[in-house]
Amino acid sequence: MNQEYLDFELPIAELEAKIEALRAASDDKVDLTDEIKRLQKKSNELTKKTFANLDAWQVSRMARHPNRPYTLDYIEHIFTEFEELAGDRAFADDKAIVGGLARLDGRPVMVIGHQKGRSVKEKVQRNFGMPAPEGYRKALRLMEMAERFKLPIITFIDTPGAYPGIGAEERGQAEAIARNLREMAQLTVPVICTVIGEGGSGGALAIGVGDKVNMLQYSTYSVISPEGCASILWKSAEKASTAAEVMGLTASRLKELNLIDSIVQEPLGGAHRSYLEIAENLKLRLKEDLAELDELSKEELLNRRYERLMSYGYC
């Protein structure tokens, strides 16, 4: 995969291009090791400085980074024996949501998540990560299966929102989301949700009701996109950066408001810089959460989840 850069990463990109050029030019006759090390140190320092001061709009763009790992990438690096299950048994199989049985260090679990595409063909196939009602009904079918077999449920959230097309509305988009919210609140097995990219409105919430809700460091969670908010309040999407600041959509802000449980640290420069490192960090978080939830009885699990939901809106 070709490395892509956002505009605020361009100075870093220039240094990395120089490093690659020196590596290509270095051979037995010309030793450029010291110069490469100097530039590498400079690049690391610049990256640390840049990412230590990201504003909310920059974080929003990081959450959408084209090289960022998606659900299937995390499944590949965290779980074993993944067996994808398809279809809602009513209308179709929505490729914007993937899910199935897997093992987390040998333990059977149910994994469900939004899936975006990388190439144009994949983006169309995955509908840009925007599920239709059948996607949410597929997710619910898998959750009900997990409850029957007493399997923990792990969800990965990464969507700009539920698909707003006419067909989706005709097939009951709002009902599908609402039903998922209700049923997830009543599941008697542990549910762990993680925002890995964009957490867009009801489309995210439909697989986001859990006992633990985590966010990756450069992910976002909001009722609307910054561009959408700006278009409504200021009649111009160009005010997106201003909207992002006032929306409080970053992981750090949502942690302050007690709307999420923990923030999973990303590698220097973002999750796309090292799929292995971010997968290891997230896997550790999932295992710790599961160990904690395993100590609770069914009644304690449900009571704690209810209290969690009822606390929203109070600081």
UniProtKB/Swiss-Prot annotation:
PANTHER family: ACETYL-COENZYME A CARBOXYLASE CARBOXYL TRANSFERASE SUBUNIT ALPHA, ACETYL-COENZYME A CARBOXYLASE CARBOXYL TRANSFERASE SUBUNIT ALPHA, CHLOROPLASTIC. Pathway: Lipid metabolism; malonyl-CoA biosynthesis; malonyl-CoA from acetyl-CoA: step 1/1. Acetyl-CoA carboxylase is a heterohexamer composed of biotin carboxyl carrier protein (AccB), biotin carboxylase (AccC) and two subunits each of ACCase subunit alpha (AccA) and ACCase subunit beta (AccD). GO terms for molecular function: acetyl-CoA carboxylase activity; ATP binding; carboxyl- or carbamoyltransferase activity. Its main location: cytoplasm. Belongs to the AccA family. GO terms for cellular component: acetyl-CoA carboxylase complex. It comes from the Bacteria. This is Acetyl-coenzyme A carboxylase carboxyl transferase subunit alpha. GO terms for biological process: fatty acid biosynthetic process; malonyl-CoA biosynthetic process. It holds the Pfam family ACCA. SUPFAM superfamilies: ClpP/crotonase (SSF52096). Residues 38-292 form the CoA carboxyltransferase C-terminal domain. It catalyses: N(6)-carboxybiotinyl-L-lysyl-[protein] + acetyl-CoA = N(6)-biotinyl-L-lysyl-[protein] + malonyl-CoA. It is found in: Cytoplasm. Its EC number is 2.1.3.15. Component of the acetyl coenzyme A carboxylase (ACC) complex. First, biotin carboxylase catalyzes the carboxylation of biotin on its carrier protein (BCCP) and then the CO(2) group is transferred by the carboxyltransferase to acetyl-CoA to form malonyl-CoA. It comes from Haemophilus influenzae (strain ATCC 51907 / DSM 11121 / KW20 / Rd). Keywords: ATP-binding, Cytoplasm, Fatty acid biosynthesis, Fatty acid metabolism, Lipid biosynthesis, Lipid metabolism, Nucleotide-binding, Transferase. It is an enzyme of class 2 (transferase).
